[in-house]
């Protein structure tokens, strides 16, 4: 076993650093003697905290700087939250590992109310996600959705300061950072369909670096990967970045994959839903099939409206 060093490019947020440390520990466990170090950096998405994500440029907000580090040989792998990873990669880079998925659900967090259903009319709910907003308002048009950005600690502090009656966050992020006790209730995927890849960690590296590919192989979780491939194929067919009101979630049932996709107006006025099953070997085709169903229902008009407001394709 080579003892070469692996340098991990990562964002500096607490959650990103947790993910990088997780990958570091898994690599060291799989390959005793391997030297693994972190190369923390700040992404554009981390710098622009005063505007909704959908308005500051959709795709690659949290990964571009990390990809530049790979291309410039300043790092060997980049660790990403899969829901932030664009569908297409720069020439010379690719996604070579998807780790086992954590809980993909959204979490309801409140100091006063036990669940979404318990919120009184007019309650203020914080989220930065158009996907969550569309589904929340479809169920509860009487709620006020208010913009919420920042890292997990910042968002919890804003809730504790009384700026919101409740906030919606990814359950996986709260669990990973030790805030499991702050989850008031988890929201079922039937009530809040997750973002594609939510809860999964992906590893990007140089396409030609076969030694790195071999080192990553023990971390690759094929069941998670098949599910995420279907979800990402749906996103790609809809030309979706990570900041659009698109949700998708795949489940393995034996050798069959079941995939549900959703496109919603941020106002909650219209929610389009489609689902289908296929052999897991056809994960990518399944994603395209469900996306085509959504397009046939009018998804393109909803997404064009959102992109028009955001000012980017």
Swiss-Prot record:
Q: Which CDD domains match?
A: PBP2_EcHMBS_like
* Pathway this chain belongs to: Porphyrin-containing compound metabolism; protoporphyrin-IX biosynthesis; coproporphyrinogen-III from 5-aminolevulinate: step 2/4
Asked if the Swiss-Prot or TrEMBL record annotates the protein with the keyword Nucleotide-binding, the reply is no
Q: Which residues carry this modification: S-(dipyrrolylmethanemethyl)cysteine?
A: 242
What chemistry does it catalyse, as a reaction equation? Answer: 4 porphobilinogen + H2O = hydroxymethylbilane + 4 NH4(+)
Please tell me whether the keyword Transferase is annotated for this protein: yes
Explain how, and how many, cofactor molecules are bound.
Answer: Binds 1 dipyrromethane group covalently.
More details:
The porphobilinogen subunits are added to the dipyrromethane group.
Q: What is this protein called?
A: Porphobilinogen deaminase
- Protein source organism: Pseudomonas entomophila (strain L48)
Name the gene for this chain.
Answer: hemC
